[in-house]
């Protein structure tokens, strides 16, 4: 993996995605405010360099569950599970955005909320409007904070995970760089949480079928929907546009501009 400072240095428009497991304390599931503050501080610092920044954030459903002290129970119907998920998203998204607004305000930075579904992308008019909204917000110097609109998204219109969403956003706004922050520090030959012999792959120059197959062995965390497979898919979507390059960092340890 190349030094992230070198990757960011010549880039103008950057999309950063952070997952649920990187936003919370593993032991309690509560929001990790120290990590959130560090992320926001670094995004503001990048913005102060004259770069345009978009944050794609997970964590709404998990934050909502934590707020109402909800634990998963057996025997729920699919409709009941969907209703609980959407209700928790409604609660959690408000709490999550309130936290981001407060943190960004500490650095005199304006944040803007954008919630998306698959219809935002597949419908030409919606996609055009979304592109214009992002463009105008970035011209204003705001940092768009993006999440999937889980409150209204059903199976038919959901994007499914924010790794994919971040790649879609990067392509939509013609970003120069997509950075995925997660609880694993890059690509391995197998899931390192399950296989201690999994080997770290420092850099991938071409997303061959072999590399895509490696991602399928990895599942998501206990609090999120993404895994290594979704990150490989995101990389493929992002790099299909010649303008977008891609990197994957461990959010727990890695600064965005070391």
Positions of PLM-derived features:
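Nucleotide/pyrophosphate-binding catalytic subdomain
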Residues: 1-239, 248
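Acidic, glycine-rich loop-and-beta core segments that form the ion-binding/anion-interacting portion
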Residues: 242
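Conserved small/polar residues in nucleotide/adenosyl-binding loops
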Residues: 247-254
């Amino acid at each position: 993996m190349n030094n992230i400072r070198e990757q960011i240095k010549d880039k103008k428009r950057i999309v950063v995605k952070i997952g649920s497991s990187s936003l919370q304390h593993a032991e309690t599931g509560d929001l990790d405010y120290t990590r959130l503050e560090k992320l926001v501080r670094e995004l503001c610092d990048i913005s102060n360099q004259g770069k345009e920044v978009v944050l794609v954030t997970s964590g709404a459903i998990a934050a909502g569950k934590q707020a109402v002290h909800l634990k998963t129970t057996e025997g729920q119907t699919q409709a009941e599970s969907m209703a609980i998920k959407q209700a928790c998203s409604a609660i959690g998204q408000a709490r999550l955005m309130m936290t981001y607004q407060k943190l960004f305000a500490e650095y005199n930075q304006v944040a803007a909320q954008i919630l998306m579904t698959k219809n935002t992308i597949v419908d030409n008019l919606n996609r055009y409007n979304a592109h214009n909204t992002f463009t105008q917000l970035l011209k204003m110097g705001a940092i768009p904070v993006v999440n999937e609109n889980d409150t209204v998204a059903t199976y038919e219109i959901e994007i499914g995970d924010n790794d994919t969403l971040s790649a879609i956003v990067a392509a939509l706004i013609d970003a120069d760089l997509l950075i995925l922050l997660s609880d694993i520090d890059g690509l391995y030959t197998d899931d390192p949480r399950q296989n201690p012999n999994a080997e770290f792959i420092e850099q991938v120059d071409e997303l061959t079928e072999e590399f895509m197959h490696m991602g399928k062995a990895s599942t998501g965390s206990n609090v999120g929907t993404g895994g290594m497979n979704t990150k490989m898919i995101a990389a493929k979507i992002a790099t299909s546009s010649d303008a977008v390059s891609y990197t994957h960092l461990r959010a727990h340890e890695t600064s965005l501009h070391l």
